[in-house]
Amino acid sequence: MYIDYLSLTGFRSYAQLDLELKPGVTVFVGPNGTGKTNIVEAIGYLASLSSHRVSSDAPLVSFDAGQALVRARLVRGSQRTSVELELNPGRSNRARINRANPVRAREILGMCRTVLFAPEDLALVKGDPASRRRFIDELIVSLVPRHAATRSDYERVLKQRNALLKSARAAGRFTSSHEATLEVWDQHMAVAGASLLAARLEALHRLQPHLQSAYRDLTDGSKAARAVYRSTLQGTVNDDGAVVSDANPEELYGLSEPELAERFLAAFAANRRREIERGTSLVGPHRDDLELILGQAPAKGYASHGETWSFALALRLGTYYLLLSDDETPGAGPILILDDVFAELDVQRRSRLAGIVSGAEQVLVTAAVAGDIPEALAGELVTVVPGGISAPAL
């Protein structure tokens, strides 16, 4: 898969940008602040409906624009598809496919597949659990786009249940009315939580061998990398937000969704008093974590800076390997985006990463200095200037 045309209107620093792209490697070069990342951010947003830089859509829309438009023409084998995404801060985003009538933005998920590497990826290893939960949730949607609804359903139920717990806490007592209503939301959250947890477990199971291969490819192979799912069904959350548990995480993989739902109901009952006291849900996928293990030790706190970078890159590269294996149809591979990554890496890691990704159908790279880009990724050079492109703009 590749994009051969991209148009941005009112997106970040671009009042209007029209850009032709080719298969192979394209390198966007320009000083920091000129808008290189804005270009690849738009493509990443088209694929995931989220930004790797901000949590809301508002910053994506130019200050003096009421909305932003991202248009792209996707090429997959002999098929060309035009996709348009309309960003409306404070209102629902809309999309168009081949200029047809508007549909929900979610309808375009899965049409454009990307894997994006960025300096922010260090947070996957060094940061709090929220970064890793976001990673696994992005993965489940990349593999099965309908899981975007699975995630949003859980978030909706969680919001309602938390509101009820907060209300009970504010009232100073837990009434029979609270109990009856909470039991209803327990059922909803158990089912929604089981669906989301099952999707995460399946995705992690599929990612695991590719993560291990990716880490070996990026390093000398002296240490093995793996990820362990830590569920609040099997432990408690400490002050740092991490799940502490001595239980065998593999046990969860053998449970069906109805069995997981029963586990959630039991956990809700066991934590009822604590949840009312705190006015929030203490058990569920929203508090789970991925524990990243390097060799025999947790990567967080024990890995060197170089190892931390290698692990972060391996998570993304492993995702690329998985998506390639998920659909072996010619032309179906994801677009690779490397946003200001090479400036952060030593020469050896630069060389290894470049050698691996150079064979992808389309690779989009940003860099402040062209000299940061390894020779293996020599390709079309596009100079970015404030508000535009010097070449090859239309």
Region locations from a protein language model:
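Nucleotide-state sensing region of NTPase/ATPase domains
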Residues: 47-147, 210-213, 260, 267-273
